[in-house]
């Protein structure tokens, strides 16, 4: 609420030189929980024979997984030539890595969340609400819901059932 439509891009740009630059991009593009970033997220580009194009792939290992809840593994994919600025930024980042592969892992989930709040405050000092890692997650879900069905968003967030869809 009350943020520009580019708020994720703005936060990622502000944090681009910091130690969480990669994690910010991953959080914005997957809706991953900070604890999932602490586990580590694999990112790579591969050629998809069916689509006949390069695909940016992100593999998230779920953390809220039990026998009857959660997705143990999630894959999020974007076309490498997607013109979304966050996809383009991650593709550019991968271009400097051998084999266009990268493992993004943070040391502490709490520190990452604190850094997002710090970056947001530096951009929007007078904003009424705290901007947290959960905001990235909710925005990712809203984006998926606007272009697909709600069940796809629930699965992408790691929920096993649409019943656990809260946003």
Which role does the model predict for each range below?
Residues 78-129, 134-135, 140, 145:
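Active-site/catalytic core of tyrosine-dependent DNA strand-transfer enzymes
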Residues 39-86:
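Conserved tyrosine-mediated DNA breakage-rejoining catalytic core shared by Y-recombinases
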């Amino acid at each position: 609420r009350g943020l520009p439509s580019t708020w994720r891009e703005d936060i990622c740009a502000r944090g681009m030189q910091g130690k969480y630059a990669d994690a910010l991009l991953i959080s914005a593009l997957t809706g991953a929980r900070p604890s999932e970033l602490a586990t580590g997220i694999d990112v790579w580009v591969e050629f998809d024979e069916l689509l006949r194009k390069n695909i940016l792939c992100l593999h998230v290992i779920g953390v809220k997984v039990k026998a009857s809840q959660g997705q143990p593994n999630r894959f999020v994919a974007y076309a490498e030539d997607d013109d979304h600025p966050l996809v383009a930024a991650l593709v550019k980042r991968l271009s400097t890595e051998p084999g266009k592969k990268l493992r993004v892992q943070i040391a502490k989930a709490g520190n990452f969340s604190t850094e997002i709040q710090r970056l947001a405050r530096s951009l929007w000092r007078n904003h009424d609400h705290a901007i947290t890692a959960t905001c990235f997650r909710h925005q990712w879900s809203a984006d998926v819901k606007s272009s697909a069905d709600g069940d796809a968003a629930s699965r992408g967030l790691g929920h096993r059932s649409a019943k656990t869809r809260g946003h």
